[in-house]
Amino acid sequence: MTEIIKALEAATSLSIKPFGTDTIEDCICYSSYVISDNGAVKQEKLELRLITKTIAEAERIKPIIISTLVTVGDNKKLNYLGCELNGGGTLKDAATGTIHTLLFFVITKKSEVKL
């Protein structure tokens, strides 16, 4: 996951934080977990929360994130077999006034499990 976080940081110039943040700033918060692993192939769900002060900034950064991660056909990116956008949405935090854009990715990798 470290390689993915570094790639997102380089592409967006935003700070990347695990789980969440307690400050009002433009950033990306993430969490990930394994959804399947059969010993040959592992799939992980990467949940990103892009936090911005304006919807215009969210709309500017969102395609950068997607193009950094999503693979087309057999064109590998980073150190995984494939990545697809699996869902998301946008909402406004009424307490802070920030825009939260959710992006859910499924990342397919070679399994690290030795059977």
Describe the predicted segments one by one.
Residues M1-N38, A56, R60-P63, S67, ...:
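Small/polar-rich, solvent-exposed N-terminal microdomains that initiate assembly or binding
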